[in-house]
Amino acid sequence: MATLYDYYKSKVITQLMHELNYSSVMQVPKIDKITLNMGVGGAASDKKILDNAILDLTAISGQKPLITKARKSVAGFKIRQGYPIGCKVTLRGQKKWHFFERLIIIAVPRIRDFRGLSSHSFDGQGNYSLGIREQIIFPEIDYDKIDRVRGLDITITTTAKSNHEARLLLSAFNFPFRK
């Protein structure tokens, strides 16, 4: 079975070298890492909520998440400095490619009322961020075993120098941008 990484090596690199007029393979942008972040609002009051979020993120990513803690106290949200408020995972190497393949082929088309992803979510330096409202779009999550529906943020960090280069890179993988 050919993976997305093999497709990148065989087709995407030559296509982008031609489109961007690069002379070296090393100039072609690539996906550096994928970061998944799940903020959990009620984690300060109930530890079980954070534990369930960690289990969900572990199932989705295939690796153990890092617990994120509050940087400073905010009285309005009833959190203090050092309280656990979420979890995150940084995917690199083969896990990055496996997750990216599952995201494009399986998960994103399962989003309710899906009409494509916004092309305005680039940050100016070639990185793309998207928010997912329901973790149940991933096939690893069993709908009957979750305690509540949670969202997560996905950031795709590339080595592209501009938004245009990053958009060409993601479009080469048939990333479903809105037309």
From Swiss-Prot:
Q: Which domain of life is it from?
A: Bacteria
Picking any one GO biological process from the record gives: translation
Q: Which InterPro entries match?
A: Ribosomal_uL5 (IPR002132), Ribosomal_uL5_bac-type (IPR020930), Ribosomal_uL5_C (IPR031309), Ribosomal_uL5_CS (IPR020929), Ribosomal_uL5_dom_sf (IPR022803), Ribosomal_uL5_N (IPR031310)
Q: Which UniProt keywords apply?
A: Ribonucleoprotein, Ribosomal protein, RNA-binding, rRNA-binding, tRNA-binding
GO cellular component terms, semicolon-separated: ribonucleoprotein complex; ribosome
GO molecular function terms listed in the Swiss-Prot or TrEMBL record: rRNA binding; structural constituent of ribosome; tRNA binding
A Pfam family reported for this protein in Swiss-Prot or TrEMBL = Ribosomal_L5
Q: Which PROSITE patterns match?
A: RIBOSOMAL_L5
Q: What does this protein do?
A: This is one of the proteins that bind and probably mediate the attachment of the 5S RNA into the large ribosomal subunit, where it forms part of the central protuberance. In the 70S ribosome it contacts protein S13 of the 30S subunit (bridge B1b), connecting the 2 subunits; this bridge is implicated in subunit movement. Contacts the P site tRNA; the 5S rRNA and some of its associated proteins might help stabilize positioning of ribosome-bound tRNAs.
NCBIfam families xrefs: PRK00010.1
Family indicated by similarity = Belongs to the universal ribosomal protein uL5 family.
PANTHER family per record: 60S RIBOSOMAL PROTEIN L11-RELATED
Query: Subunit structure of this entry?
Result: Part of the 50S ribosomal subunit; part of the 5S rRNA/L5/L18/L25 subcomplex. Contacts the 5S rRNA and the P site tRNA. Forms a bridge to the 30S subunit in the 70S ribosome.
Spell out the protein name for this chain: Large ribosomal subunit protein uL5
Source species: Buchnera aphidicola subsp. Acyrthosiphon pisum (strain APS) (Acyrthosiphon pisum symbiotic bacterium)
Name of the gene:
rplE
